[in-house]
Regions:
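A short, N-terminal "cap"/entry segment at the start of jelly-roll beta-barrel domains
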Residues: 1-15, 26-30, 106-113, 131
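N-terminal regulatory/effector-sensing and dimerization cores
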Residues: 16-106
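Solvent-exposed, amphipathic alpha-helical segments
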Residues: 45, 117-128, 176-184, 228, ...
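Aromatic/histidine-rich interaction motifs
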Residues: 99-123
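Short, Lys/Arg-enriched, Trp-marked, Pro/Gly-tolerant hinge/linker segments that flank
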Residues: 107-116, 129-144, 148-187, 191-198, ...
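Terminal helix-turn-helix DNA-binding modules in bacterial transcription factors
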Residues: 179, 183, 187-193, 200, ...
Length: 277
């Protein structure tokens, strides 16, 4: 079976930065002003989670709570005993253009008991969180990044994402076409060629792709290519080289597709991205 995450993670990395380990008591809030999300591991204790004034969920067993994008949230715990957390900021390279981050729901809550393959990582992470070992920060950050990959696996394997790219990657046939696009965006992918990758007829493939992924195959291909182009633009690469690598025959063809996708030319986008950085 093709590796569904290899090309995604090779092109668009995910990173974590641990910022809390220990008890949280009473009311604790995180705003959405910073350009990253959070991954919280609740080791013990009861936690009420609120999004604004609305009670979103109640956690009463060891669980993880992932916010892949900035989203304000509050935790309400017992004032005296609280709950034990280990928390990290998470960042998906490219921000909103990152296809992994964009494919995830606004938040994910999973009991740790549903992550059996992750137990050795979690045990080491909790042990490290309690220690004062040298390299503790770097160790925790890397362990959180491994947990993120495990979350992606679970969401696909357990079919917990109903639409979008991850839903397509969970489909035994569609995943072959998606992986082919991710691994070789420079190829001249026709609808027939992608349907052949999936082992489906042209019509069946187009319908199934649109229903599961939420885009036509052609729209998805363009979005993937332009996402890669944006990454290369941030790295200062020339439009001519980028056009060849992401599947456009010329700078002009890339510029037309780029403007259709983003509303601006590659140079305009690069200048505005540099100002925002």
């Amino acid at each position: 079976m093709a590796d569904r995450l290899a090309a995604l993670l090779a092109h668009f990395s995910v990173s974590a930065r641990t910022f809390h380990a220990g008890a949280l008591c009473g009311i604790n809030a995180l705003d959405a002003t910073e350009p990253f999300g959070q991954l919280h591991l609740v080791r013990d204790g009861r936690v009420e989670v609120r999004h604004g004034v609305r009670k979103a969920l109640e956690i009463d067993e060891p669980s993880l709570l992932l916010y892949p994008r900035p989203m304000a949230h509050r935790f309400i715990t017992d004032k005296r005993h609280g709950a034990t957390f280990v928390c990290a900021h998470v960042q998906f390279e490219g921000g909103p253009a990152n296809p992994i981050g964009a494919a995830l729901p606004p938040f994910v809550c999973l009991p740790l008991a549903r992550l059996p393959a992750c137990q050795p990582i979690l045990e080491l992470l909790f042990l490290e969180a309690e220690s004062e070992n040298c390299g503790r920060q770097a160790m925790l950050d890397r362990l959180f990044e491994l947990v993120l990959i495990q979350i992606l696996r679970v969401l696909m394997e357990q079919g917990q994402v109903e639409a979008g790219m991850l839903a397509g990657l969970a489909d035994e046939r569609l995943r072959r076409a998606l992986v082919a696009v991710h691994e070789a965006p420079e190829r001249d992918w026709s609808l027939e060629a992608l349907a052949e990758q999936a082992g489906m007829s042209r019509t069946s493939f187009a319908t199934a792709f649109r229903d599961r992924v939420g885009l036509t195959p052609g729209s998805y291909l363009q979005r993937w290519r332009i996402g890669l182009a944006q990454k290369h633009l941030r790295q200062g690469r020339s439009l001519k080289l980028i056009a060849t690598e992401v599947g456009y025959g010329s700078e002009a063809a890339l510029s037309r597709a780029f403007r259709a996708q983003t509303g601006s030319s590659p140079r305009e986008w690069r200048n505005s991205d540099a100002v925002d950085a």
